[in-house]
């Protein structure tokens, strides 16, 4: 059966309808759809049925059940009447428009990325690494060099250190004069011409303990070859 646009069924869409079935039950709900077999779809539907008492003295009572969305078969339908007009919000778009301002309860997409104008978090001062180009070795030190260049630089540094004059603290005078050549110390006779002056004690040896073994004291001839020199003061000579 073809349903025309002028059908009475189309005029009752979204109305509250009362539908009575063959078994006496009553369904009241919002009429949403139908077909040529008179199968109906009701939303927000309530069921009302009358329960007969067991005793004749008791009155017949009515029971109500909330069903929700219901599909009624047309073969069980007896009558269909209008219960009330459609709701006032019928036809209003429930999807928010693109230009409309969102209110509470409207879902919004989660933000992606960092919003503009928000400062980036920075690490504490003790945990932050050095700034690029600051706090590390210079670029000249990190530049790779050949073996000859490194050796020449090391030799130049050693020569500059060895040739630098030694500075002594003020108030203590200059370095002692070299021993072995030049004028003898006061209190000693000069050696005859053509004879080397005796060697003094080595540098750093405390005075008063004599000369080391093998070197005679000043003014004394050295022992002949193959013979030991005199023992130092305070030491007994070896037994024969």
Swiss-Prot record:
Can you list the GO cellular component terms from the UniProt entry? cytosol; methylosome; nuclear speck; nucleus; SMN-Sm protein complex; U1 snRNP; U2-type catalytic step 2 spliceosome; U2-type precatalytic spliceosome
| SMART domains according to UniProt | Sm
Q: Which Pfam families match?
A: LSM (PF01423)
Keywords associated with the record? Cytoplasm, Methylation, mRNA processing, mRNA splicing, Nucleus, Repeat, Ribonucleoprotein, RNA-binding, Spliceosome
Localization: Cytoplasm, Cytosol; Nucleus
| Residues carrying Omega-N-methylarginine | 108, 112, 147, 172
Record protein name field: Small nuclear ribonucleoprotein-associated protein B'
Query: Gene encoding it?
Result: SNRPB
